[in-house]
Amino acid sequence: DLVQFGQMILKVAGRSLPKSYGAYGCYCGWGGRGK
């Protein structure tokens, strides 16, 4: 769905950003999935 798609975009974008932003994106992705 759109939520999962958005999380996927965050993870992909995080890889091209500085490490601090990448880590933030990972936290958002994991937190959003509730795992």
Curated annotation (Swiss-Prot):
Which coenzymes or cofactors are required? Ca(2+)
Enzyme Commission numbers on file: 3.1.1.4
The positions annotated for binding Ca(2+) are Y27, G29, G31
Q: Does the keyword Calcium apply?
A: yes
Can you name one GO molecular function term for this protein? calcium ion binding
Q: Tissue expression, per UniProt? A: Expressed by the venom gland.
Q: Can you say what this protein is called? A: Phospholipase A2 neuwieditoxin-1
**Protein source organism:** Bothrops pauloensis
